[in-house]
């Protein structure tokens, strides 16, 4: 059980980054933010996620109930914790400022499956996962060649052969989840459920396919975030007729254009701001589309400020926000009419006096 005091501890004394806590806490926070945005009448047209971020994305899409989403996250933390303590060879992960194609020759210098490209974050950013000694050796090589690299604060080599040791156990623990397709969503609510673009496949995924085996692939397989986000940007409207997995046929010769105007990151920090900007800038059409990016939360910044800043960006894009709910959230007294302040200082129109 998570003690509330754990969050308030100094980072070096807190176990919040331990997988037994971090997986569940992060997903719970993301789900809460999804519900908060819905209460403000903010509904996405499409969603995608990076690694475990897909769990909350599936919840936002209506594929997973809150109970099932939290089960997927909790048991992910359980098996990761088990691997952390029982693994014969310690694992690690490292962010590298190269493309998957550029970094592969470096990985080929090691034994097969010792190091893998775990995440393709953007055209110029990947995450490498594997044996800790190999990670350290690769880091030194890249440092010598003045290539950016940074070890991540994780003790498990996610999205690598290391995870295969707990894959079947994870599947058995989450085998009870029941993903919901559009046929299980009432007719009046279907239009508000977003499309789900998978970073496991890089394509749109029908909601009913987000079953237990999918979440095993999400834990073990490569994260194709750059591909899934790019696909989302171009195919949101073309697929909007129905989230059934069937692609709407394009008119012959029709030019593919970006179909989104704003990307919102939902999580404890703007962790994907760099990769997202790199994805948008690397594609001429996406770069020209001037797609806005905002994060609901930013580390060491007041959460009210960042959340309302995100709302302000959406307002500037003419999105219909429910200001009544924002200004008078649930739990406040109802029936009280806001009072107009009439005794505040008047605006100074006389600017003839000089002060400097």
Where are these regions (language model features)?
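FabD-like malonyl-/acyl-CoA
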Residues: 1-109, 147-157, 161, 166, ...
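Short amphipathic alpha-helices in soluble, non-transmembrane regions
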Residues: 107-109, 135-145
């Amino acid at each position: 059980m998570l003690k509330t005091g754990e969050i308030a501890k100094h980072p070096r004394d807190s176990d919040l980054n331990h997988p037994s806590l971090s997986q569940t806490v992060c997903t719970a926070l993301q789900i809460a933010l999804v519900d908060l945005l819905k209460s403000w009448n903010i509904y996405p047209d499409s969603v995608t996620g990076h690694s475990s971020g897909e769990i909350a994305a599936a919840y936002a899409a209506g594929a997973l109930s809150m109970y099932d989403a939290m089960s997927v996250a909790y048991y992910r933390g359980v098996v990761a914790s088990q691997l952390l303590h029982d693994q014969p060879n310690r694992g690690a992960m490292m962010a590298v400022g190269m493309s998957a194609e550029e970094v592969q020759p470096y990985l080929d210098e090691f034994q097969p499956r010792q190091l893998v490209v775990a995440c393709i974050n953007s055209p110029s950013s990947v995450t490498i996962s594997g044996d800790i000694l190999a990670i350290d050796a690769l880091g030194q090589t890249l440092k010598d060649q003045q290539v950016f690299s940074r070890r991540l604060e994780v003790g498990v080599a996610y999205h690598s052969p290391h995870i295969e040791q707990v894959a079947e156990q994870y599947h058995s623990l989450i085998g009870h989840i029941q993903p919901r397709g559009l046929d299980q969503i009432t007719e009046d609510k279907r239009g508000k459920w977003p499309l789900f673009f998978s970073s496991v496949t890089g394509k749109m995924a029908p909601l009913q396919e987000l079953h237990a085996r999918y979440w095993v692939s999400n834990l073990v397989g490569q994260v194709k975030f750059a591909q899934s986000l790019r696909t989302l940007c171009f195919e949101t409207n073309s697929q909007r007729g129905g989230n059934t997995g069937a692609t709407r046929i394009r008119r012959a010769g029709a030019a593919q254009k970006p179909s989104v105007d704003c990307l919102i990151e939902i999580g404890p920090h703007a962790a994907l701001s760099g990769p997202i900007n790199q994805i948008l800038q690397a594609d001429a059409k996406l770069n020209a589309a001037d797609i806005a990016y905002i994060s609901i939360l930013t580390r060491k910044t007041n959460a009210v400020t960042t959340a309302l800043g995100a709302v302000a960006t959406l307002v500037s894009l003419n999105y219909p926000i429910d200001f009544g709910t924002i200004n008078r959230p649930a739990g406040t007294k109802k029936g009280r009419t806001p009072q107009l302040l009439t005794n505040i200082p008047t605006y100074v129109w006389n600017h003839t006096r000089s002060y400097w």
